[in-house]
């Protein structure tokens, strides 16, 4: 909570648990959510399938949508807006102020997953966002030794606007407590703890909480190295003729560079997405040829790792859904670690050589 500048936080058993509880805390059967289409594959299916089966509808919008297109997605029963600060794995920088302003114009909160930038590089509350979620399994831990998530409440949203009776009317399951009256600015996070955590039980294991605290002690140092290493790798890839395209918001050539400088002026994250000439087959050869980097589904680790999202993290999505999420068949997600940058570059160079022979 202190890192994000919020009034309170709740640590959960996973990032997915945090996302689900963040939404269910204010949304129930008959409700509606507006969600960016460029989100983690598990998050997409949470909104597309699981919440739908619970009676909660979702309208997906492009993270590149205009203000008018975003506003058109709202309904009378919309309860919140959800997006990722920096999308996984397409690395689109979401216009936080536009999403937050649209949410507030319709009387609902804006929820943002801030996993990739971390509060070291971006503090969404400063741009109008109301609730932040994290998969603490990623950079906050940084060592891939624990599984967890977190919800952080800014304390800025007015729950007394008439749209959220669950905060202004007595909760009969908790001695008639009225969250907005009893907890004030911390009403949202208090309800998540007293109501949802009680009923769902997705709390963090004690050892995972210990490892998370340990990892966060070096968060600022690690993020600085992740970002500087990733910038060097991205600049190399951009100049290599064997590479078809590179997307990293830190590059001036990125269509999201301007937004990145607005919301993350000191760095974005250590993740790069790119494609090799030769498409999916070349991508497979490249990953198989890496020696230092590991081919794993994990991301945001202090060790360099690589992944093909279309066949792993996003494999359950249709071709059309993959396109909407910005996941092309040739996309390689490179999570740059904190090793010596020359060692990482040498590994990439030799793998490119083998992949494009």
Regions from the PLM with identified roles:
Residues 1-5:
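PLP-dependent amino-acid enzyme catalytic core
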Residues 7-11, 244-247:
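Short, well-structured beta-strand/strand-turn elements
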Residues 8-239:
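Conserved PLP-enzyme active-site core in the AAT-like
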Residues 30, 41, 48-49, 57-58, ...:
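PLP-dependent enzyme catalytic core of the Aspartate aminotransferase-like
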Residues 120, 141, 254-256, 281, ...:
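Flexible loop/turn segments at secondary-structure boundaries
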Residues 158-159, 219, 279-282, 313-314, ...:
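Short, acidic Gly/Pro/Ser/Thr-rich loop/turn segments
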Residues 223, 231, 237-238, 242-332, ...:
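Conserved C-terminal alpha-helix-loop-beta "cap" of PLP-dependent enzymes
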């Amino acid at each position: 909570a202190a890192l994000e500048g919020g009034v309170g936080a709740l640590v959960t058993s996973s990032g997915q648990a945090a996302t689900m509880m963040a939404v269910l805390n204010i949304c129930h059967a008959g409700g509606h959510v507006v969600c960016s289409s460029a989100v983690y594959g598990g998050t997409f299916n949470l909104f597309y399938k699981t919440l739908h089966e619970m009676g909660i509808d979702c309208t997906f919008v492009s993270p590149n949508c205009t203000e008018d297109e975003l506003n058109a997605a709202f309904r009378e029963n919309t309860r919140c807006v959800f997006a990722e600060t920096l999308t996984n794995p397409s690395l689109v920088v979401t216009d936080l102020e536009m999403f937050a302003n649209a949410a507030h114009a319709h009387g609902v909160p804006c929820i943002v997953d801030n996993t990739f930038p971390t509060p070291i590089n971006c503090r969404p509350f400063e741009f109008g966002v109301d609730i932040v979620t994290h998969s603490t399994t990623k950079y906050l831990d940084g060592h891939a030794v624990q599984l967890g998530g977190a919800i952080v409440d800014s304390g800025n949203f007015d729950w007394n606007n008439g749209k959220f009776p669950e905060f202004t009317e007595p909760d009969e399951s908790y001695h008639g407590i009225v969250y907005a009256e009893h907890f004030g600015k911390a009403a949202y996070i208090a309800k998540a703890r007293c109501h949802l955590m009680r009923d769902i039980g997705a709390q963090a294991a004690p050892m995972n909480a210990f490892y998370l605290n340990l990892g966060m002690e070096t968060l600022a140092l690690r993020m600085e190295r992740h970002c500087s290493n990733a910038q060097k790798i991205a600049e190399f890839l951009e100049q290599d003729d064997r590479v078809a395209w590179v997307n990293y918001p830190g590059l001036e050539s990125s269509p999201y560079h301007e937004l990145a400088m607005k919301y993350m002026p000191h760095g974005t994250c250590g993740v790069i997405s790119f494609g090799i000439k030769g498409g999916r087959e070349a991508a497979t050869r490249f990953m198989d040829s890496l020696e230092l980097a590991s081919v794993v589904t994990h991301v945001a680790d202090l060790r360099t790792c690589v992944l093909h999202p279309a066949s792993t993290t996003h494999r359950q999505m249709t071709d059309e859904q993959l396109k909407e999420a910005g996941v092309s068949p040739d996309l390689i997600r490179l999570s740059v670690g904190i090793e010596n940058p020359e060692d990482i570059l040498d590994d990439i160079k030799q793998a490119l050589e083998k992949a494009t022979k």
